[in-house]
């Protein structure tokens, strides 16, 4: 018997919204991950295991073959670069926007911007495409604070409702990308386990369509 397929799921909001889709596709965890300290979970299918990890770890796990399939936000995939993986399915969940934001009524800066973000690669590529020089400062949280204390002119961050920005005197100024949750697949696994993986992908596509239909 071949080894089980491994699916890597992102912790947090994406996990909560992904589990019902997997259930509809015939894959259900045998125990509640919220009540367990486990990292590897058995499922209702003997040939499928699930690991639950940080969102930013999903792409490298799939890229290097530690997981055959992964589920992560498009923002994480953009930052990672997508090397070594296919991105065949948009689950259309955890939707938001990746945006540039600045202080309200902020004056135009000079030729060089200072930008705070955890999406360093995305920010550098975005400003390079615009022909603008930008010093990108990597932060890990509370991006809204950076313009308030003069650390940065702009931030690049995920925006859902925009309430946190407005509460701190900031406003979104430029849209970089619409974000949703995607399924990624290891390139080698897609060749060696094509039938098994494609069956799961097809069922997920059906589950997404059914969810949209209401």
UniProtKB/Swiss-Prot annotation:
PROSITE patterns per UniProt: ATP_P_PHORIBOSYLTR (PS01316)
Disulfide linkages recorded for this protein, renumbered to the chain, are none
The pathway is:
Amino-acid biosynthesis; L-histidine biosynthesis; L-histidine from 5-phospho-alpha-D-ribose 1-diphosphate: step 1/9
Give yes or no: UniProt keyword Cell membrane.
no
What this protein is called in its record is ATP phosphoribosyltransferase
- Could you tell me which Pfam families the record lists for this protein? HisG
The UniProt entry, under InterPro entries, shows: ATP_PRibTrfase_cat, ATP_PRibTrfase_CS, ATP_PRibTrfase_HisG, ATP_PRibTrfase_HisG_short
Give the comment on domains.
Answer: Lacks the C-terminal regulatory region which is replaced by HisZ.
Instruction: List the CDD domains.
Output: PBP2_HisGs
Q: Which reaction does it catalyse?
A: 1-(5-phospho-beta-D-ribosyl)-ATP + diphosphate = 5-phospho-alpha-D-ribose 1-diphosphate + ATP
* Catalytic activity, EC: 2.4.2.17
A GO biological process this protein is involved in?
L-histidine biosynthetic process
Summary of the function given for this chain in its UniProt record: Catalyzes the condensation of ATP and 5-phosphoribose 1-diphosphate to form N'-(5'-phosphoribosyl)-ATP (PR-ATP). Has a crucial role in the pathway because the rate of histidine biosynthesis seems to be controlled primarily by regulation of HisG enzymatic activity.
* Keywords, in A-Z order: Amino-acid biosynthesis, ATP-binding, Cytoplasm, Glycosyltransferase, Histidine biosynthesis, Nucleotide-binding, Transferase
Sorted alphabetically, the Gene Ontology cellular component annotations on this record are: cytoplasm
Gene Ontology MF terms: ATP binding; ATP phosphoribosyltransferase activity
Instruction: Quote the subunit structure annotation.
Output: Heteromultimer composed of HisG and HisZ subunits.
What NCBIfam families does the entry give?
hisG
Record's subcellular location = Cytoplasm
Q: Does the keyword Glycosyltransferase apply?
A: yes
- The enzyme class is transferase
Q: Which family is this protein grouped under?
A: Belongs to the ATP phosphoribosyltransferase family. Short subfamily.
Supply the source organism for this entry: Alcanivorax borkumensis (strain ATCC 700651 / DSM 11573 / NCIMB 13689 / SK2)
